[in-house]
Amino acid sequence: MSTFERNSSAPPELDDIGVNLPAPADFSTALAEGFARRIGTLARRGGASGEAVKWAARAAFAASRATAEGHVCLPLAVLARRFDASSAEVRAALFASGMASDGSQSAAALRPLVVDGQGRLYLARYYDYERRLARSLVAHAGVNAGASAGVDADATAQTLHERLLRYFGPQQDDEVDWQRVAAVMALSGRLTIVSGGPGTGKTTTVVGVLACLLDARADLRIALAAPTGKAAQRMQEALLARAGDLPPELAARLPQTSYTLHRLLGSGPGARFRHHRDNPLPYDVVVIDEASMIDVAMAAHLLDAIAPQTRLVMLGDKDQLAAVEAGAVFAELSARPAFTENGLQRIAEALGIEAARLSEALPDASGGFDEGPDDFFAQTGAPDDFDTPLDDVFDDADAHGAFGGLPGDDLFTGTTVPVAEIGRAHV
């Protein structure tokens, strides 16, 4: 049973088809009721049958409430069970109402509700956010996405190893150093997700990565950002505090300010951000802290604004500070990763350890994490078998190749990453 099914009141019927609505318990419920009435009215005006109108209203209420609770979508089966109906019956009624699309249409052509091929019910806006995000992730992490600032595709494992020694120091013990693993991946890919709890060294890792990049290219344009002003300030202070360990000439090149995501993207009086696909951010490297707070809408806008050649590093704790709005994007993207033999070998060579040793310390594909990676782990890109509506997008875009990770290597298999809906509805 889903969280939505346990916690939500049953979708109401419309007053004007003979069923009284309960008094709204809160604003989101009132909003859902108003939306349900509107969808029912539009369906009836369009000539839909009474049964189709009723299901359109029920679905509108359920989708709106799910979004208010942080879910991007919910299984149609959840709604069907409430009224002892089958998913097939509900799907047919929704399409007959004229208020639902199957998701194959362009954003402008979507109806208010979307029922995808896997039986998930969306508000059209959130379906489009998720679809845009999926396509942007595939395009940005793709090995053929074009030259990437600071991505040293021709760097040998020895070069990477020397840079790690220079800016991370020598290996301290026999344990796998996950900061170094994260650094190798961040130095070798356009999209890197770094998840770890407080004190696991995310900031130290970023400082080292930026030092390695600036050492290779002194004129890199770097931006630091976070979802809130307080988080952005903390990130800036932590980075500058650790910059004292760097050579002065490198420390001086680190960014001296940070931004909120809205300021970074250029929020203004209009509905659209100033930076988007047609006017991308003018940076070579963008580092986002507290990324677990980013919802699916902001993630879609952010990826739209990242130029193909720009490196994006996202830091956060997948177990804390969930997004306020719908879509726990960071938690989904930092789910259990898996690596191919080529990828393991390249990372191991850069670290100066045996590939077998690294492999043994990696997350257990059957479900759990070993102690080390659970505390600190990084991955590039995202898997190709998102068990979600993103699945079709990734399949169409050849995501297995797109998320090869390190240039020239099939680093990230993605075949053992059971990522559920982008959102908190894991059913």
Where are these regions (language model features)?
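Conserved ATP-binding/catalytic motifs of P-loop helicase motor domains
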Residues: 2-426
